[in-house]
Amino acid sequence: METTHTVAIIDGQGGSLGKSLVEAIKARFPQVKVLAIGTNSLAASAMLRSGADAIATGENPVVVAARTADLIVGPLGIITADALHGEITPTMAVAVAQSRAHKILLPISKCNVSIVGRQDLSLGEMISLALEDIQSFLDSPPHAR
């Protein structure tokens, strides 16, 4: 029997990125448990409607998921205090940044951070690349992570 991994998807604002990620991950990796965490109830609700296995809202769920998830996926801002127009608290950013979980961060430009050398990709292209990274993670033996 295949090991079930927990993927925490963290998003804020209206949750459109998180919604797209949940849909894509559940379609490609149905065996994966997806925990969707919204920094607000609107984002959490959008991710629930897209098929997440569970949802939560706010700072403490981010902190708990950072301790327990195998993978964390979301916009780059989730490791930057005050990003997403102030929705990412310093506690959230530190919890995600220090988490032992493998992190797949999409360089969405809403956090006053520029990534030099970053390509201008569409959201769909970034999600496709994120899915490839998730596949690589799932295929790698635990000791190689």
Where are these regions (language model features)?
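Glycine-rich phosphate-binding loop
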Residues: 54-92
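Short glycine-rich or small-residue beta-strand-to-loop segments that form or flank ligand, phosphate
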Residues: 6-11, 72-79, 104
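Glycine-rich phosphate/diphosphate-binding loop of Rossmann-like nucleotide-binding domains
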Residues: 5-41
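N-terminal beta-loop-helix "entrance" segment that forms/cooperates
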Residues: 33-57, 113-118
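Short, ordered loop/turn segments at secondary-structure junctions
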Residues: 12, 39-42, 60-61, 78, ...
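Short, glycine-/small-residue-rich phosphate/pyrophosphate-handling segment
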Residues: 105-142
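A short helix->loop->beta-strand "cap" motif at the edges of active sites that frequently abuts
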Residues: 31-32, 98-103
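A charged, well-structured terminal subsegment
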Residues: 67-74, 79, 128-145
